[in-house]
UniProtKB/Swiss-Prot annotation:
Domain of life (superkingdom): Bacteria
HAMAP family registered for this protein in UniProt: ProQ (MF_00749)
Family, as annotated: Belongs to the ProQ family.
Protein name: RNA chaperone ProQ
Origin species: Serratia proteamaculans (strain 568)
GO cellular component: cytosol
Chain spans, region Disordered: 105-185
InterPro entries linked: ProQ (IPR023529), ProQ/FinO (IPR016103), ProQ/FinO_sf (IPR036442), ProQ_C (IPR035236)
Basic and acidic residues bias (residue ranges): 145-157, 169-179
Length: 236
């Protein structure tokens, strides 16, 4: 029992590091960029404390440096710091660009997840409304009484027979067929500045092609966010 770790999650490890090294780590607010190679410094400084393992430290560092508040702190002119808060050199431009790309992709994933969740909610609400049973007739309400004296109904002219009209296709089906889009199978046919769609669940978002790369297409959403999307998520 003595060898069991006291800190069971990466969040608990981050809270411990923020308390142990307050000039380097923070539990809330904007985070400071960390020194390159700080993992080895952590192993040497906290080895044996709280029964922390290298795996726990590595997982906590990965979670800390991928958080939005840390990525916001990686900007031009910022200084990296060591465990004691001492500056260890200014951030390079390539590191700043990489952090911005990670932040934009994370925001785009959250936006796509929200759009998919909203689509599922609307679909579930439609199914629930369609399955709702009709309300029963209120108790005590009787059908309309027949005419007194059993009088025969007035002679009425038979209605002229009308030709059956062909069933009209529902408007929703027509709109759906009109809005059906073609998936992108060859990204080499795309052009810079071309308007396309980015599929997110059952909905699609407007986007503009910024760059065609080997691993996908870099696009800019209508919200201003830029991200790299694989071909199977693109539509004309």
């Amino acid at each position: 029992m003595e060898n069991q770790p006291k800190l069971n999650s990466s969040k608990e490890v981050i809270a411990f590091l923020a308390e142990r090294f307050p000039l380097c780590f923070s539990a809330e607010g904007e985070a400071r960029p960390l020194k390159i190679g700080i993992f080895q410094d952590l192993v040497e400084r906290v080895q044996g404390e709280e029964n922390l393992s290298k795996t726990q430290l590595r997982s906590a560092l990965r979670l800390y440096t991928s958080s939005w508040r840390y990525l916001y702190g990686v900007k031009v002119g910022a200084q990296r710091v060591d465990l004691d808060g001492n500056p260890c050199g200014e951030l390079e431009q390539q590191h700043v660009d990489h952090a911005r790309q990670q932040l934009e992709e994370a925001k785009a994933r959250v936006q796509a997840q929200r759009a998919e969740q909203n689509a599922k909610k609307r679909e579930a609400a439609g199914e629930s409304a369609a399955a709702e049973p009709r309300r029963p007739r209120p108790a005590g309400k009787k059908p309309a009484a027949r005419r007194e004296g059993g009088a025969a109904p007035e002679n009425r002219k038979p209605r002229p027979q009308t030709r059956p009209q062909p069933a009209r296709q529902p408007r929703e089906v027509k709109e759906e067929s009109q809005q059906r889009r073609v998936p992108v199978t060859d990204i080499s046919k795309l052009q810079i500045g071309q308007e396309i769609k980015v599929r997110a669940g059952q909905s699609a978002m407007d986007a503009t092609v910024l760059e065609i790369a080997k691993d996908g297409v870099r696009v800019q959403l209508s919200s201003g966010l830029a991200m790299i999307v694989r071909a199977e998520h693109l539509q004309f």
